[in-house]
């Protein structure tokens, strides 16, 4: 350590960390180093979709650790092949590139869009369109793809090749097919940007424009995928077929893994040497992904989540009706946002004092991300705490 520098932690301070030191997790709960128990409705930022340390995933990881941890992608990996087969069977895509995170998955999508355009002879198609208030990562290219000025501050000049359009704006759709666009990248529900859901007519029109012009439609499912919004992938209820999707977070139930899925004719642009990942789709990560998907795809699992998801939405609406501090309730499934009139941080702090963990989605939105395995009793604990916080912060919860 430098003799002129004194720091309290050797970890770089890239996060404004909450005053909790997590030591254990199980199901919907997290414990700190003092033994305090918290209802964790952050799910590791939409990652622990099966709750903390799910038994089946733990067993799959433990069993794989006995045989092989890592061998690189120079060799065939059976668990990787099996996971890819599952992902393609239950989506409209054909082939998978594995990596370690959401940002890496989106980087892969950006690269394949550029390569596909070159392979097709679309030399003038040098732009990828993304949308205002999007979030696609913090690497060089994914930060540039993220249409939020606060994410860009201090990192200019940004990577070139991205153009931003307003989200859910039908008038701006005419700007997509301008001869320069290789791909459109978007979230069906903008998570970090404030829980904004794509309107069905808008997204279907966008998809039709892309299909007619051979512009790649790429859906970022990092936060919305793996059952988070009620279907395996958030794009599926819209009746569209993206050319590329990206997944991570919930895919490994907290074990690091990411993936970029593409149609076969697009995947062909990634020939040997064009892209790679040392650890991507390693045997342990793939085992975690297989176990996760098997649970979520099991008979009745997603259907059984619907009652709790509807209950959460209805209860949040009822709190809004009696609290002048709540402006709107947004989201789908177990990806919900409460837009408040004051600062979201005030709600988050009050809830933490009541042993409930939630997240911000911007300055004015409280983000609630229960695990898909949460119970009715746990949901009621959260709802009751929200009612109490609304009252404490000035809401009229007496009707």
From Swiss-Prot:
<keyword id="KW-0808">Transferase</keyword>
<dbReference type="GO" id="GO:0005737">
    <property type="term" value="C:cytoplasm"/>
</dbReference>
<dbReference type="GO" id="GO:0003992">
    <property type="term" value="F:N2-acetyl-L-ornithine:2-oxoglutarate 5-aminotransferase activity"/>
</dbReference>
<dbReference type="InterPro" id="IPR005814">
    <property type="entry name" value="Aminotrans_3"/>
</dbReference>
<dbReference type="GO" id="GO:0042802">
    <property type="term" value="F:identical protein binding"/>
</dbReference>
<dbReference type="InterPro" id="IPR050103">
    <property type="entry name" value="Class-III_PLP-dep_AT"/>
</dbReference>
<keyword id="KW-0028">Amino-acid biosynthesis</keyword>
<feature type="binding site">
    <location>
        <position position="277"/>
    </location>
    <ligand>
        <name>N(2)-acetyl-L-ornithine</name>
    </ligand>
</feature>
<dbReference type="InterPro" id="IPR015422">
    <property type="entry name" value="PyrdxlP-dep_Trfase_small"/>
</dbReference>
<feature type="binding site">
    <location>
        <begin position="102"/>
        <end position="103"/>
    </location>
    <ligand>
        <name>pyridoxal 5'-phosphate</name>
    </ligand>
</feature>
<comment type="pathway">
    <text>Amino-acid biosynthesis; L-arginine biosynthesis; N(2)-acetyl-L-ornithine from L-glutamate: step 4/4.</text>
</comment>
<dbReference type="Pfam" id="PF00202">
    <property type="entry name" value="Aminotran_3"/>
</dbReference>
<dbReference type="InterPro" id="IPR049704">
    <property type="entry name" value="Aminotrans_3_PPA_site"/>
</dbReference>
<protein>
    <recommendedName>
        <fullName>Acetylornithine aminotransferase</fullName>
        <ecNumber>2.6.1.11</ecNumber>
    </recommendedName>
</protein>
<keyword id="KW-0663">Pyridoxal phosphate</keyword>
<feature type="binding site">
    <location>
        <position position="135"/>
    </location>
    <ligand>
        <name>pyridoxal 5'-phosphate</name>
    </ligand>
</feature>
<feature type="binding site">
    <location>
        <begin position="220"/>
        <end position="223"/>
    </location>
    <ligand>
        <name>pyridoxal 5'-phosphate</name>
    </ligand>
</feature>
<feature type="binding site">
    <location>
        <position position="138"/>
    </location>
    <ligand>
        <name>N(2)-acetyl-L-ornithine</name>
    </ligand>
</feature>
<feature type="modified residue" description="N6-(pyridoxal phosphate)lysine">
    <location>
        <position position="249"/>
    </location>
</feature>
<dbReference type="InterPro" id="IPR015421">
    <property type="entry name" value="PyrdxlP-dep_Trfase_major"/>
</dbReference>
<dbReference type="GO" id="GO:0030170">
    <property type="term" value="F:pyridoxal phosphate binding"/>
</dbReference>
<comment type="similarity">
    <text>Belongs to the class-III pyridoxal-phosphate-dependent aminotransferase family. ArgD subfamily.</text>
</comment>
<dbReference type="GO" id="GO:0006526">
    <property type="term" value="P:L-arginine biosynthetic process"/>
</dbReference>
<feature type="binding site">
    <location>
        <position position="278"/>
    </location>
    <ligand>
        <name>pyridoxal 5'-phosphate</name>
    </ligand>
</feature>
<dbReference type="InterPro" id="IPR004636">
    <property type="entry name" value="AcOrn/SuccOrn_fam"/>
</dbReference>
<keyword id="KW-0032">Aminotransferase</keyword>
<comment type="subunit">
    <text>Homodimer.</text>
</comment>
<keyword id="KW-0963">Cytoplasm</keyword>
<keyword id="KW-0055">Arginine biosynthesis</keyword>
<dbReference type="InterPro" id="IPR015424">
    <property type="entry name" value="PyrdxlP-dep_Trfase"/>
</dbReference>
């Amino acid at each position: 350590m430098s003799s002129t520098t004194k720091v309290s932690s050797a970890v770089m301070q890239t996060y404004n960390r909450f005053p909790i030191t997590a030591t254990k997790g199980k199901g919907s709960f997290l414990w700190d180093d003092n033994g305090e128990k918290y209802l964790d409705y952050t799910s590791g930022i939409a990652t622990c979709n099966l709750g903390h340390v799910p038994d089946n995933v733990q067993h799959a990881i433990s069993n794989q650790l006995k045989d092989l941890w890592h061998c690189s992608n120079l060799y065939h990996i059976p668990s990787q092949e099996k996971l890819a087969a599952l992902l393609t069977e239950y989506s409209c895509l054909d082939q998978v590139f594995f990596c370690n995170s959401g940002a890496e998955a989106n980087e892969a999508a950006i690269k394949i869009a550029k390569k596909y355009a070159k392979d097709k002879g679309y030399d003038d198609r040098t732009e990828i369109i993304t949308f205002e208030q999007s979030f696609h990562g913090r690497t060089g290219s994914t930060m540039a793809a993220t249409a939020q000025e606060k994410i860009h501050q201090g990192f200019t000049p940004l990577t070139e090749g991205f153009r931003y359009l307003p989200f859910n704006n039908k008038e701006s759709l005419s700007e997509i097919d301008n001869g320069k666009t290789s791909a459109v990248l978007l979230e069906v529900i903008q998570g970090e940007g404030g829980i904004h859901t794509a309107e069905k007519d808008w997204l279907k029109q966008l998809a039709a424009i892309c299909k007619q012009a051979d512009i790649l439609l790429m859906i970022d499912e990092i936060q919305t995928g793996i059952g988070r919004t009620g279907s395996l992938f958030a794009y599926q209820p819209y009746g569209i077929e993206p050319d590329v999707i990206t997944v991570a977070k919930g895919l490994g139930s907290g074990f690091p893994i990411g993936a970029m899925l593409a149609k076969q004719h697009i995947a062909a642009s990634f020939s040997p040497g064009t892209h790679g990942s040392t650890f991507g789709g390693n045997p342990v990560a793939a085992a975690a992904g297989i176990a996760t998907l098997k649970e979520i795809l099991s008979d009745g699992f997603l259907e059984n989540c619907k009652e709790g998801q509807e209950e959460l939405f209805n209860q949040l609406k009822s709190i809004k009706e009696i609290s002048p501090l709540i402006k709107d309730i947004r989201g789908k499934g177990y990806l919900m946002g409460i837009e408040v009139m004051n600062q979201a941080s005030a709600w988050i702090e009050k809830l933490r004092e009541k042993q409930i963990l939630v997240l911000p989605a911007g300055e004015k939105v409280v983000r609630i991300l229960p695990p898909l395995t949460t119970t009715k009793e746990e949901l009621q604990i959260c709802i009751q705490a929200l009612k109490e916080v609304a009252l404490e912060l000035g809401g009229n919860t007496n009707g």
